[in-house]
Curated annotation (Swiss-Prot):
Its EC number is 1.4.4.2. This is Probable glycine dehydrogenase (decarboxylating) subunit 2. Keywords: Oxidoreductase, Pyridoxal phosphate. It comes from the Bacteria. GO terms for biological process: glycine decarboxylation via glycine cleavage system. It catalyses: N(6)-[(R)-lipoyl]-L-lysyl-[glycine-cleavage complex H protein] + glycine + H(+) = N(6)-[(R)-S(8)-aminomethyldihydrolipoyl]-L-lysyl-[glycine-cleavage complex H protein] + CO2. The gene is gcvPB.
Length: 500
């Protein structure tokens, strides 16, 4: 049930601590003429409702979450605690620089750390989501070409295994997308790349390791080809976790990168957000970076603005990005240190390769059996579907009954009936072994009880949804009652407490 379905007129009982002063000085013109259509429930009913919902949540705090290309790692509670210190929370974004030196120091150090681990010449912390970071990266590439009068470059090259945001970003920046194929080993087809590159090439967008879970073996040659043609290289930082502290995108030849803090640097995902995706640039793109950026000059931290970077592509937010998320990432990298970041990549690769080997032994088909998993890998159920009729979606739904979140399904699109599995570095061997056991059980069920798997899930609060009906008959908002309640109507009195 929705909270609105618990609502009863006049039931607005709640406890409230005494206030120092009533807000009686609000101008009449700013007051609502009708009361907001909020649910009217008792405090106890509200607490019970949301507690029940929280108990139905499936999250990284409750279960193993091997969602490929998402890096669902544990978020250390120390990061939350320190980022929520009163000194940070009470600071106004527009407070004078002189009163925010501690915060600015944290942001400056985060910029410097991200520069170091990515091999970039400069970093801006302002983008507020991965997709926005992508957009800014391609916008800087466009600004670079336009500053040189090189307006004939109208194409962005994108591999067929790329995230869907890559071509969308290129189109939003006014470019034509040129898709190139992947070879049988999961690498970008070099012949296709050479054929696609030319005087119209503005750049190449690449994720490395790719969404196929393998490292691009020819990345240095790809960089040479694109740069020789006058284009630039964009690095989608979605899978940076796999190479953190081991390989720097700047050393591979990339000119611009965005970093998903909710993946590599363990800030909360989704509803635990908001997001943040700093961008890093090579020297040639420094003049176009979004502002503000923190500078350290003469022993003082300060904001660099459009006055300092006149060719900047501009601002992305009212202030400087999602400060609370950036603080969490800063605490995370300080907790890890350089050695800890090395271990992140090592254990991400170790867990992925161990899990891949165990599932292969269990009878699952690996999409790229000759390649080492970088941090994730793909299982294809193409043959299983032909033999039993069980699809990747069926198996994913059945995993929910076993207490595991499903891996990413049907992505990348070029691998049929695929599961993209990423265990992340924070999972224990015992957790991975238990997951393998569950996968073995489901594999046996596909042979002995295929209908059980096809009709899953059976134990979740919500069963299988009608995807077609949901898409065609949208029901996205609560339909409020038509009666308006005016401010002059008699309301149920709320008890007050006098304090001596």
């Amino acid at each position: 049930m929705l909270i609105f379905e618990h609502s009863r007129p006049g039931r607005r009982n709640y406890s409230q601590s005494p206030k120092a002063a009533e807000a009686t000085d609000i101008p009449e013109k700013l007051l609502r003429k009708t009361l907001p259509l909020l649910p009217e429930v008792s405090e106890m009913d509200a607490v019970r409702h949301y507690t029940r919902l929280s108990q139905k949540n499936f999250s990284i705090d409750t279960h193993f979450y091997p969602l490929g290309s998402c890096t669902m790692k544990y978020n250390p509670r120390a990061c939350n605690s320190l980022a929520m210190l009163p000194q940070f929370l009470a600071r106004h974004p527009r407070s004078p620089e002189s009163t925010g030196q501690g915060f600015l120091a944290c942001m400056y150090e985060l910029q410097e750390i991200l520069k170091d681990v990515t091999g970039m010449a400069g970093v801006s912390l302002t983008p507020m989501a991965g997709a926005q970071g992508e957009l800014i990266g391609i916008a800087m590439i466009r600004a670079y070409h336009e500053s040189r009068g090189d307006t004939a470059r109208t194409e962005i090259i994108v591999p067929d295994a790329a995230h869907g945001t890559n071509p969308a970003t290129a189109v939003m920046c006014g470019y034509k997308v040129v898709e190139i194929a992947t070879d049988k080993e999961g690498n970008v087809d070099m012949a296709a790349l050479k054929a696609a590159v030319g005087p119209k090439t503005a750049g190449l967008m690449l994720t490395n390791p790719s969404t196929l879970g393998v490292f691009e073996e020819n990345v240095a040659e790809m960089s040479r080809i694109v740069h020789q043609a006058g284009g630039l290289l964009y690095y989608d930082g979605a899978n940076l976790n796999a190479i953190l502290g081991k390989v720097k995108p700047g050393d591979m030849g990339f000119d611009v990168i965005h970093i998903n803090l909710h993946k590599t640097f363990s800030t909360p995902h989704g509803g635990g957000g908001p997001g943040s995706a700093p961008v890093g640039v090579a020297p040639r793109l420094l003049p176009f970076m979004p502002v503000p950026i923190v500078a350290f000059e003469n022993g003082t931290y300060r904001w660099q603005t459009e006055k300092d970077i006149p060719q900047s592509i501009g601002r992305l937010s009212a202030h400087m990005g999602n400060a609370g998320v950036l603080l969490r990432a800063y605490v995370y990298v300080r907790l890890l240190g350089a050695e800890g970041m090395h271990r992140v990549a090592e254990f991400a690769a170790l867990n992925a390769n161990y899990l891949m080997a165990e599932l292969r032994k269990a009878g699952f088909e690996i999409a790229y059996p000759n390649r080492r998993a970088s941090h994730e890998f793909i299982v294809t159920l193409k043959d299983l579907k032909e033999k039993t009729g069980v699809t990747a979606m069926n198996l994913a739904k059945r995993l929910l009954d076993k207490g595991y979140h499903a891996p990413t399904t049907y992505f990348p699109l070029l691998v049929p009936e695929c599961l993209l599995i990423e265990p992340a570095e924070t999972e224990s061997k015992e957790t991975l072994d238990a997951f393998v056991t569950a996968m073995k059980e489901i594999l046996e069920e596909t042979r002995t009880q295929p209908d059980l798997v096809k009709s899953a899930p059976h134990t979740t609060p919500v069963r299988r949804l009608d995807d077609v009906k949901a898409a065609r008959e949208l029901d996205l908002a609560w339909k409020a009652p038509t009666r308006n309640i005016t401010r002059t109507e008699t309301l149920t009195p709320i008890p007050t407490v006098s304090v001596a």
